[in-house]
A protein has these predicted regions:
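Hydrophobic positions on the alpha1 helix immediately C-terminal to the Walker A/P-loop
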Residues: 18
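Extreme N-terminal, non-catalytic leader segments
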Residues: 1-6, 10, 31
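Conserved nucleotide-sensing/catalytic segment adjacent to the nucleotide-binding pocket
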Residues: 34, 41-103
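Post-Walker A helix-loop "phosphate-sensing" segment adjacent to the P-loop in P-loop NTPases
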Residues: 24-34
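Conformational switch/transducer regions in large eukaryotic molecular machines and scaffolds
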Residues: 98-117
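Conserved lysine of the Walker
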Residues: 15
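Active-site signature of alpha/beta-hydrolase-fold catalytic machinery across serine-
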Residues: 21
Length: 119
């Protein structure tokens, strides 16, 4: 069965560095490994804009990163699919979303599905 490892720590403490090294070591040992970040589950750019417009006086919803700015349903579907080994599509692969923070002039947007990781 799959093993899921979650890392939670403050910004700038080395999570990406640790995870990159773990991935390298696991793949070198012959294990299939996928890395994802909570950032990969931000709302799409259009959804972010709609949320900000719906709550114009809430500064926490004007930018990504705060509670309420993630697609939790997509995150749960993806994690469940990874632990089951398929995402319900006919090819039995799991598509892991990616988020492009540089899109829309730095406001960010979910990357097109063609750029998602497939395992």
């Amino acid at each position: 069965p799959p093993v899921v490892v979650g890392i939670n720590a403050p910004q700038g403490c080395g999570k990406t560095t640790i995870v990159s090294e773990m991935q390298r070591m696991l793949e070198k040992a012959g294990h299939q490994c996928v890395v994802m970040s909570i950032d990969d589950f931000y709302l799409t750019g259009a959804e972010q804009d709609a949320l900000a417009a719906r709550f114009p006086t809430n500064p926490l919803l004007q930018v990504r990163g705060n509670a309420g700015t993630h697609d939790l349903a997509l995150a749960l579907r993806t994690i469940r699919a990874l632990t089951r080994g398929d995402d319900g599509t006919s090819d039995d692969c799991v598509r892991v979303p990616r988020y492009d923070k540089s899109a829309r002039g730095g406001k960010g947007d979910r990357a097109p599905e063609g750029e998602w990781s497939v395992v």
